[in-house]
């Protein structure tokens, strides 16, 4: 099918042909068009990576905006993917399409999004918006759910289900387009979505899959190939591809494994007499990584590898560094990338040969377990660059001959696992039950049962039988009892209503169990506690905070340190002596304590390398940790305000939230909060030079500021201009001493005194 044949507005059709160079559709794209994609039909598209799902979603979204004058929502699982989609959709800006991405601030309605046509969010952010119901939500005509196989995920899956259920309860009836490469039961998922299924195995580049053992690749339906070389499997497979002009993507089950692989391959490539890279381009990329990274340690490691045309890639690297590395691989400057499986989750980064280094990974408490088939399919889907590679290869390395046939049958010949709902697990059901009541999607248990029936769980046979047997009603009733006990919901006859506190818990996107723990911690807050340490040790109890692993040789030191800070530890173990003896039960507590200490180092301006050395928290992990902690400290602040705690506590939490966000001491808050382009390093330099307020900077000259290390003419001009405008408009945000010190005295007669 040609683009000229599509029922599209002429300006979109002309744009696709003249600017994007697209004249014909791939077979799966044509099938989706014939199924009614451009006519408002719900579509579930399950097709291989690089088969055109992304382009089709873009065309459908832009068409919806131009033809129907409606907004299009694009929901993705990861922040990194949201910004990749933002870049993709921004190419349509010359058609007048306004595109925005929103991934954080769960308690904000984001009214500003009303000015945009295509809105890209994470699943969580979209669910939070549907709780708040901003006015623009009523003009949504389309929902695109990217990577919809995440419905199988324990945490994100129920959120996808909640989004669909809420849209149905609002009677918005937007067109729903689900996209995935790997679903074992797409018919069932399509039926739940009331969607037409477009399923295709077609690929623009053929895929050869095989298993490697002792120098031989056994392909499925394609015989065997002997790989020349001595000894190491990874080196042999990598060099075989490089000699043929291809790139290699190696997947490892762990970060340490990815780093080890990158080191080994870089050493071989750099010592090889064969020239595989352009040294000049590799040097430029290495320098860009050095300038982007906040960690000198990681920058040194990466630049050495990149100069050999190799890099590693995992979530411990900052997002900005990962983007530089990804772009270097796309441009062919990097020939080999060693990554954890997180790279397979949606980021568009294909290679000639994909190598799966191991099909088992270590899970604490379980030992080594086999990866899911779906995960392998996601990795294998990265093989083959359309327009660049004549074929793609996905090869799994095994250590014994007996594994060859087993792995072929298990991973290559088998379909991915069925996706299933996780909505009915107690934690998820409690979270979404409070949401349904507090956001007025349901006011009775009957309506909650109806809400649940709109989820994927409600569609699947097991839950249907449970509804008929009234067991779902009993589950929901028990959860309501618990939410009433927590003080989040009240009963008024058959009617259910969120309390003021319950409404805050819902608006802040807290799960009820975590909110209950927070309230208990606020109740126990006393004047002896250091508010910052106490609050950080309270929020790290949330399951949303990734915990720092404790090594056995750290237990004694951490236990002693915790004992020395006993008055600032909320909801602590009952006996200091028991803690010092660190029985097994206390290891989780010490992990929380270590995590809080890492955050304390961050807000006290320790540099990223020092935090990484002391706490084994890499820069990317630190960003995630600070992002999550900022959100949870903000939630704690709102709870403290609602519960009637003193203004000093509320203001202290407000200051702490910003300190966690920016990683600064309290004296720098005014600079980092008010000024764009001024982070912790630049703010400290300004402060040390005597510029301690916005008013000081408003009086400065460019020549004064450029004497400060790290500040050039452009940055200096921007800082002064911002400061002038803020002072002129009276918009300077101030943090006085009582605000930042955050005394812990509780207010009297507040809601907290009546809840427990």
UniProtKB/Swiss-Prot annotation:
Q: In the UniProt record, what gene is named as encoding this protein? A: hel308
Motif window: DEAH box = 146-149
Family statement drawn from the similarity comment of this UniProt entry:
Belongs to the helicase family. Hel308 subfamily.
Source species: Caldivirga maquilingensis (strain ATCC 700844 / DSM 13496 / JCM 10307 / IC-167)
User: Where, by residue number, does ATP bind?
Assistant: 29, 47-54
Q: What is this protein called?
A: ATP-dependent DNA helicase Hel308
Query: Which EC main class describes this enzyme?
Result: isomerase
Q: Which InterPro entries match?
A: DEAD/DEAH_box_helicase_dom, Hel308-like_dom4, Hel308_SKI2-like, Helicase_ATP-bd, Helicase_C-like, Helicase_Hel308, Hlx-hairpin-Hlx_DNA-bd_motif, P-loop_NTPase
Top-level lineage group: Archaea
What does the record list as GO biological process?
A: DNA repair
Q: Does the keyword DNA-binding apply?
A: yes
Which UniProt keywords are listed?
Answer: ATP-binding, DNA damage, DNA repair, DNA-binding, Helicase, Hydrolase, Isomerase, Nucleotide-binding
What role is this protein assigned? DNA-dependent ATPase and 3'-5' DNA helicase that may be involved in repair of stalled replication forks.
Ranges for domain Helicase ATP-binding: 34-201
- Sequence ranges assigned to domain Helicase C-terminal in this UniProt record: 233-435
What are the disulfide bonds?
none
Q: EC number(s) of the enzyme?
A: 5.6.2.4
Quaternary context: Monomer.
